[in-house]
Structure formats: structure tokens, C-alpha cells
Amino acid sequence: MDKKSNQVERPVVFFDISIGDVPVGRMKMELFSDIVPRTAENFRQLCTGEYKRNGVPQGYKNCLFHRVIKDFMVQGGDFIKGDGTGAMCIYGGDRFADENFIEKHTGAGLLSMANSGPNSNGCQFFITCDACDFLDGKHVVFGRLVDGLLTLRKIENVATGPNNRPKLPVKITECGQM
């Protein structure tokens, strides 16, 4: 994987995160545009706000992480409904097909698409907090954390209530491309 990374310029995007009203750090993520170009581009444009509907930028700015499960993953990206039921993508409609399952859920800090079954990718994503190979072949891994593991751990350790929803808002206050 590192060899490919040196041969192809992969985009790097970022999230600035706050918990409650307190800024807790930045996460920088490298997108696997050479392995899953459609999935990576969907995420990239939702980070930058380039994609617009009716002239309004769509994306992750001010979006919440709505599901946090310690030692498993943190999930966000539902800027449509905020509760894990919303979907949207840059390709027209709400969802797009699974691109491939080449990359695996081998450890912490991997970006993967949240879905509701095969070929149901939209805007929701999760970041792994540990290896979770039981997700291989079901969720498309499309990037990795290159900086900000401590910020991920801060999100992972937020107190949660029903449906693993954080008791304090965990918000993407700013996002974009490096």
C-alpha cells in the first residue's frame, strides 16, 4: 500500500472536531483515490463543499458524529437528518454502488462507508477504532487517518446514551482539503 501511496498523489482532507463547545483537535485523512476513485471523490467533495444542490453547498461542515461505540468505530456524515437515516451522494440520487472491497478493516483509523446493505453508500461513513474484519466485504474502506489518532480516541471515549448516541454533540466544525 505504501508503494502505491508514493506513486499516486492521494487527496488529504481534514476534520476539525469539537465535543460540546470545546475544540478537541484535527483529523487528517488520506483518501484511496487510486483504489476506490468514486467513493474517495464522493467523500472529498462532501469535505470541501464543492458539490451543490440548488446552489447550496452540501457536506460535512457542522455535521455530527451520531454513533460512537468504544473499541469499534465512530460514525457520522448524516448531514441530511442527523440521526443515521439520511443519505445523499454526489452522483445524483441518494446512494451509489459498492466500488470494491480491496482494502480491509485491519486496524484503527480506517475510513469506511456506512450503509444499509449492499450498494447503499451515501454520505455516511465511519472511522474504525480497532480491527473489525467482520466488516470486510460489506463496507468499502476508502481512506485512512494520517494524523489525529488522539482526536479519534477523544471521540471514541465520549459518554453515550440510547442507540450509542453521544451525550455531548461531537461536531465537525470545519472540513476541507489540505
Swiss-Prot record:
SUPFAM superfamilies recorded: Cyclophilin-like
Cellular-component GO terms for this entry: cytoplasm; nucleus
Pfam families according to UniProt: Pro_isomerase
Classification via InterPro entries: Cyclophilin-like_dom_sf, Cyclophilin-type_PPIase, Cyclophilin-type_PPIase_CS, Cyclophilin-type_PPIase_dom
EC number(s) from the headed UniProt entry: 5.2.1.8
Cross-referenced CDD domains: cyclophilin_ABH_like (cd01926)
Primary location recorded for the protein, binned into one broad class: nucleus
One BP annotation, GO: protein folding
Physiological role: PPIases accelerate the folding of proteins. It catalyzes the cis-trans isomerization of proline imidic peptide bonds in oligopeptides.
Protein name: Peptidyl-prolyl cis-trans isomerase H
Gene that encodes it: cyp7
